Structure formats: structure tokens, C-alpha cells
Amino acid sequence: MNTFQADWGEIPQMPKDQVFTPQDQLTNYNDNMMDNLLDFNYNDVDALLSEELKDLDIPLAPSPRDLNMNAEQSLNWMQDIQGHRSNKPSMSHKRGMSGTAIFGFKNHNKTLSIASFSKNTDIINEAENENVKGNTDNQNGFVLSQVLLKQQEELRLALEKQKEVNRNLERQLRENRLQQEHIQRVLHDQEAVTSQLTAQNVTESPSKQRSPTKYQGDDAIIVTKNSSSGGYVFPPPPRVTLNNEAVTPPLSFSRFSNIDQMESSDPLNYLQPNADFTEAYASHKTPESSFGKEHASVLSTSEFLRPTNAARESSSKAMYSSPNSMISPHRKKDSVLSTVSTILQPQDDYQNTASPPSQMLNLEEANLENEQKNNGKMLRAPVEIMPTIPGSKNNTPMTANKSGFMPQKHTFQHTPVKAKNNVDMNERSLVRPELSGTPLNKSVQNGMHFREEDDSNILHHISEIPQGSTSHNNTTAGDDSNVSNRLQFSNTESSPSRQRKKPTTLPPGYIDRYVKELPDKNFECLFPNCGKFFRRRYNIKSHIQTHLEDKPYKCDFEGCTKAFVRNHDLARHKKTHDKHFSCPCGKKFSSEQSMMKHKNRHNCTGPARVPDSKMVSKSPRKQSSPTKLSSAIMNSPIKENYLKENTNLHIDQLRMDPKMRNALEDGGLLKPVERTEAMAFPSPLSGYSDLGSPFRDLGTIEE
């Protein structure tokens, strides 16, 4: 582009004072309009075209505005053009082949190369890009400014909200501070009042501090607690009226934080003339009885309630006036008010103390007893039938008072329990009975124990144990009644009865190790190499006891050392010791077969021996039961003498073979049994069914 301007600069210019004609003005006007319409400079287009024409080796003619130049100048211009054409090299692409073949030139290619135009286009594009970039930057700046303004507005709103929250917090803090100051003032006032009250209590006299509270109603009750023994003592010592002045032994009471809230009421007194309380107390004993107004008069006319002896009055006042010299029957405790229904129980706190109040009460009881005897109305204390309360000093059944009047002191509990007998026992001597053999017979000799897994049920079935089976180290022959009472008491106090566990000499739960309960309610033995199944737990436990050689049932017969797993096995064994079969030589046997063997061994002086080969062998199923046969023989009073002499002989005849018996009879060695009316021998049982009826055989022999 600069090259073109330099080239055009060599063209001779028109003088400045040259005057343009109207035609020239019109031409200039048209040129200006074209420049304005096409929006580019005419000189630039001219230079562009001139450059392209030079590349195409096309000679250039002067422009119309240069027509007024003189000839010399024109010639010079032509020469300059030629010289410039010959001397100045091409600035485009070293005059390479251009795409001018479209114009019909020879040896020209079809590739169009317009370097200057592309450069100009690049310049225009760069300018446009700069304009677009500037516009984009302006737009981005506007958007950014809008965002910043919006954020500033949001921050301003948030700041205002935070200021409002801060103001609310400050207001709450001020209110809390005021409340705390008010609470501190109230606490300070309360502390001041408390300190004043404490100072007043400290400066009070001991008698005022220990003065009892007065109850509002007659049915109010003092419940004492925090005593040395941990029990409750009720009622307080009675008030004694001396010259119309009520004197009450002091009773300690708990200090309340606010003394104004303490209730005042009179202590309960059994000896004061109060008919309503007397009726209420009598109804506690028996609802049907009436302990009413007539007895109130008896109490009011007591000599002790209005004594005339001045010495007694002075001694009583001296006793209650000084708290140091007085012996209070109450232990140190705190008392509170309660209206809970109570149960009274005496307590022997005054047995070993000869205090003046107890002596005075004894005198009072004696006077009341005399007056009641005179009036024919003897009253008994209703509390003698009350049960023992846990927590009292002595848990023994109370007995009637000698004077027949109220006891001196009582204990208070909410829940009564059964009384316990005052009988010395050795650490559950009735709880774990020692049993052996039959559990209900002779249970001490062999030392077999019932092992209970649950101690809460150890007293069940205790009534089944006979008196001879219990052993006590301190029990004498005169305590049989106490033992029976103790057994009865254990029965009533025991937990619900449960079936006794199976006796065993093994530790608890040892047998269960070998028991496996199956889903089908069967049981499998887990003992090595066993694997048997049972349908009942009792059976499998007995089976396992045979594996473990656990035989708790021992025979108590003298000289017998056998033991069994089951009780019925022991019972069957004991029958072997019952010898109902006696030999003429004096020996006794438990079975007939044993007796016959004895006779056949030449050890007996009885009848002749029968050969063993001739003995009739019977099936064990058909042998008679020795118990049934012996009972049939021994229970017949008509044939007692006859059977005593002839039973053994008759049995021998029945045991013989018929042919053997006939041979002996023919030889005169065996005398047949005669038929008599006295011979009403009972028919043999099933054991002799194979021989038939003995009378039929005898009848055959006689024939």
C-alpha cells in the first residue's frame, strides 16, 4: 500500500493556482459521492487496481485528472513509468504465475493471487474485531456493574437484618439481667430470714426445742423414724394429768425449713378420757364389741389420773421438768405426721430399766384392774392377737400382759407378715430333710439328701415327713407339740407346692447333662455308647442313674446293703425280707420254692425229702404269688389250727407227680388227706392251674 503511494507521488501534480472547470467540479463531486457511497477512498481503490495491473504487465494510462498536464510532463511520465517498470522489482510474490488465464494470456495459470487486497481485508477485519471487542467489553462491563449493584443491595438488606437481631438480643440481655438481679435480691432476703430464724432456734431453751407438736385431729398418728435400731416406735409415752396440768415426756422432732408450715396437734394418749378414740380402738379389735362411754368413766375416775399424794406430784414434776435428769422411753428419732393405717405391736424396751414412767404405768394398770374387777368388767388388751411386724425388736408371738391392760410401747409398720415361732432350730433342719430308702419312712439312717435347685421351694411337702425323721440338736422329748406346730407353720408359710424332684446322690443338674430333648417330645440318652430313646423324662433320668450307678433308694433291712434307682424296685426287694413260709425245723423263707430247696438239702428234720427229678417245674408266669398265698392262709380264722399243722404236708403232696404220689401211697409212705368238713382249704391260685384241683386228684386216688 505504501509502495503505491510512493508510485503515485512520482506522478507530476497540478499547480496549486490552476482553476478547475465545471466539468472538473462535477467529476470531483461524482468521485466524492462514490467515495461516500462505497465507504472507501478512491485513491486506495486506484492504487489497488494499479498494483494488480502492474502484476499483469498491463500498461497504465494517466487518470482523467492528469489530462491537463503538458506534453513534456506526459512524456516524462511515460518514461518514468517505463523506467519504474524496468527498475523496480515486484513486491508481491516475485512475479510468479498468477491466475490471469481467464483473460486469455499465454502461459498464465488459473490461480488468483491478490496479496494487497487480502492485506487490506485483514486490516479491515482487525478494525472490526477491535470494534466488536470494544463493544463486548462495554457490554461485559455493564453486566458486571449490574451484578455489583445487586450484590451491594443484598448486603445492605442483610446488614439491616443483622442490626435488628442485635437490637433484639440486647433487649433480651437487659431483661435477663433485670430478672437475675431480682432473683438475687429475693435470695438475699430469704437468707436473711433464714439466718434470723436459725439464730432464734439456737437461742431457744432445750425444753422448747424438744416440745412435741400438737395434732389437729384425734385420729392423727406420729410416725417415728431414724431410730437407733431402724424401727418405728408407736405411740409416744402417755400424758399424765397432775393437778389439771398435762405433763408429756419430750419427743424429738424434725426441724422444718419453714416453721410456719409445721402443723400442731396433740399426741395420741390411750389413758386420756377420750370416748371417741376408745370406741375406735375397740372396733379395731372386734367390730361387734363396744368399748364406749362406760369405760371412759372408768378411765376418768382412775386414782392415778388424779393423784392426791403431794410427794408423787412433786416427783413427777421434777422428773419431767429437767431434760437431763429425765429418762425418755423413746429413742432419739425424728417424727413426722402421717395418717396411714397402722398396726400396733408391743416392744420390750423397758424390761431391764426401772424408769419412773414405767413404774407409774404399772401402778396405773394395777388401779385400773382393781376398778374393773369391782365393776365386773374386765378388759383385755386388744393387741395381744396382733401378728409380729418385721423390723420390731423381737419377732416372737406376744403373750397376754399380766395386768391385762395395754402394753407400754408399740412398733409401727405398714406391711404385716406372719409370726415366727420361738423354737430353736438348726439352720433349716426342716428345710433339707435327710431321707434314705423309702422317702416317707426311716429317712435318717442312710443319709440320702433331697437336693433342691431352688431354695424358694424347699419347704414343699414338708408335712409328709414323719416326726421321727426330723432331727434337732436342742429338741427334747417335751418339745413334741412344738415340733408338730412347727411342721404346721412351715406348711402354711411355704410357697405353692411343687412336685418333689427325683432323689439323687449326684450334684444338681448332673443328670440333665446326659438328657437331650427332641422336637417330638422324646428324650435321648447322651451317655457314651447308649443312644436309647424314652418318652418320659422320669424314665430317662432313671436310666441315666443306672449308668452313673446313682442308687438313692437303699434297703433299711438289717444286714442288707442293696440300693436301687427306683422306689418300686426297693418295694419289690423288701418283699423278699418278708418270710411267710416256715419250716417245721423253725426256719422261715420268703418263698415256697426256697423252703422246698431247704428241705431237699437234708438240712431239715421235717418230712421225707423229695427227689429233685420228681419236682414239677413250673413256668414263672404260673407260679403263685407268695404274698397272695400267705395272706389267704394267714387270714382264715376257721382253719387256723388245721392249716398250721398240715399246710406244709398238703403243699408237698400237691407238688408231687401223680404217679409218684400213688406209688408212695401204695407203699404206705404217704398218708392221704382225709375228707372232713373242716378241710375247706382255699383253692390254689393261678400257679397251680396246671395240676388241676387238688380235691379232684384226691378223689381219684380214693377211687
Curated annotation (Swiss-Prot):
Under the heading Pfam families, the entry gives: zf-C2H2 (PF00096)
List the subcellular locations.
Nucleus
Keyword list (alphabetical) reads: Cell adhesion, Cell wall biogenesis/degradation, Coiled coil, Metal-binding, Nucleus, Repeat, Transcription, Transcription regulation, Virulence, Zinc, Zinc-finger
Region Disordered: which residues? 197-216, 312-333, 465-509, 599-635
> What is the predominant subcellular site recorded for this chain?
nucleus
Phenotype of null mutants? Leads to systemic infections characterized by fungal escape from the vasculature, tissue penetration, proliferation in vivo, and considerable overstimulation of the pro-inflammatory arm of the innate immune response.
Coiled-coil spans in chain: 148-187
Report the record's Gene Ontology biological process terms: cell adhesion; cell wall organization; G1/S transition of mitotic cell cycle; negative regulation of transcription by RNA polymerase II; positive regulation of antisense RNA transcription; positive regulation of septum digestion after cytokinesis; positive regulation of transcription by RNA polymerase II
Extent of Polar residues compositional bias = 197-214, 312-327, 466-497, 622-634
Gene3D superfamilies on file: Classic Zinc Finger
Q: Which SUPFAM superfamilies match?
A: beta-beta-alpha zinc fingers (SSF57667)
Gene Ontology molecular function, alphabetical: DNA-binding transcription factor activity, RNA polymerase II-specific; RNA polymerase II cis-regulatory region sequence-specific DNA binding; zinc ion binding
Function in brief: Transcription factor involved in the RAM (regulation of ACE2 transcription factor and polarized morphogenesis) signaling network that regulates polarized morphogenesis. Regulates expression of genes involved in cell separation or other cell wall genes. Required for regulation of morphogenesis, cell separation, adherence, biofilm formation, invasion, as well as virulence.
Protein name in the entry: Cell wall transcription factor ACE2
